[in-house]
Regions:
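Extended hydrophobic leader/signal-anchor segments used for secretion and membrane insertion
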Residues: 1-110
Length: 110
């Protein structure tokens, strides 16, 4: 994974929206490991093709339209949120990190 040169190794992110319910809810704070290898099923912080930062679930590795490596990212709540069903495959360099745990309000590993 690339695209993390200007990021710290670890960081906090705040959840906005309901696209990842019931796993994450609005206002949750999560710990992100930037540059961590992505595996299918992992929660990731990604920059979607429209520039939006979002937490989504990495479903599977897929090629982008240009043939480069990427990920098919989905919302846990299929009724809400925008994901690869709407925006297509997200390039590897746009997958910024892996969400390791929720730190607030109820800490738990993800």
């Amino acid at each position: 994974m690339t695209g993390t040169e200007n990021h710290p190794q670890w960081g906090l992110a705040r959840v906005h929206g309901r696209s990842m319910t019931p796993t994450l809810t609005p206002g949750d704070r999560v710990l992100v490991r930037y540059g961590a290898p992505v595996t299918p099923g992992a929660l990731v912080l990604a920059r979607l093709p429209d520039g939006t930062l979002a937490i989504k679930r990495a479903r599977e590795a897929r090629a982008t339209r240009s043939g480069g490596p990427g990920w098919w990212l989905l919302s846990d709540n299929a009724v809400e949120g925008v994901d690869s069903r709407h925006r297509g495959v997200v390039a590897d360099e746009s997958v910024l990190g892996v969400v390791r745990l929720r730190v607030w309000p109820r800490p738990r590993r993800l």
